[in-house]
From Swiss-Prot:
Catalytic activity: (R)-4'-phosphopantetheine + ATP + H(+) = 3'-dephospho-CoA + diphosphate
Main location: cytoplasm
Top EC class of this enzyme: transferase
Protein name stated in the entry: Phosphopantetheine adenylyltransferase
Keyword terms: ATP-binding, Coenzyme A biosynthesis, Cytoplasm, Magnesium, Nucleotide-binding, Nucleotidyltransferase, Transferase
Keyword Electron transport assigned: no
Residues binding ATP: 10-11, 18, 89-91, 99, 124-130
Domain of life of the native organism: Bacteria
Known partners and oligomeric status: Homohexamer.
Residues the record marks as site: Transition state stabilizer: 18
Subcellular location: Cytoplasm
Functional pathway: Cofactor biosynthesis; coenzyme A biosynthesis; CoA from (R)-pantothenate: step 4/5
Species for this entry: Nautilia profundicola (strain ATCC BAA-1463 / DSM 18972 / AmH)
Organism placement in taxonomy: Bacteria, Pseudomonadati, Campylobacterota, Epsilonproteobacteria, Nautiliales
């Protein structure tokens, strides 16, 4: 059976933690749609186009990956892509509460969509895009936090 999943996020910017989740999801599914969100509620450091470009570069070596942007409800995007599985990453208990609420909200909007939660490997558990942005703001070195493929682009 052919299976595909959506891994949504703002990815501002993509981190090694995101890439860790993507690589592990590739072992579980035939296709992963990395859905870069155009979230008007978030003030992003990078434009939507740049975030899509960075994600494409970071995942170019992974054949199961398709990168797209979206600006709708996630469940609507999932329906459009005929996808019934959403992947989310959990770094800490603080992520769990928010992700659980979002998972239930998505389920209430479409009962056929399930959310799968993956934890990153321990060495990536502390990495977040907001940490990377904070370091970048002060011209710090983030090379150990982001995929090698995008270092020159930041």
């Amino acid at each position: 059976m052919y299976t595909k999943a959506i891994y949504p996020g703002t990815f501002d910017p993509v981190t090694n933690g995101h890439l860790d989740i993507i690589k592990r999801a590739c072992k579980m599914f035939d296709k992963i749609i990395v859905a870069v969100a155009d979230n008007k509620d978030k003030k992003t450091m990078f434009s939507l186009e740049k975030r899509v470009e960075l994600m494409k570069k970071a995942t170019s070596h992974l054949p199961k990956i398709e990168v797209e942007s979206f600006n709708s409800l996630l469940v609507d995007f999932a329906r459009e892509k005929e996808c019934k599985i959403i992947i989310r990453g959990l770094r800490a208990v603080s992520d769990f509460e928010y992700e659980l609420q979002m998972g239930y909200a998505n389920k209430s909007l479409d009962s056929e969509i399930d959310t799968i939660y993956l934890m990153p490997n321990l060495e990536n558990a502390f990495i977040s895009s907001s940490v990377v942005r904070s370091i970048l703001k002060y011209n710090g070195d983030v090379s150990h936090l982001i995929p090698n493929e995008i270092i020159k682009d930041l």
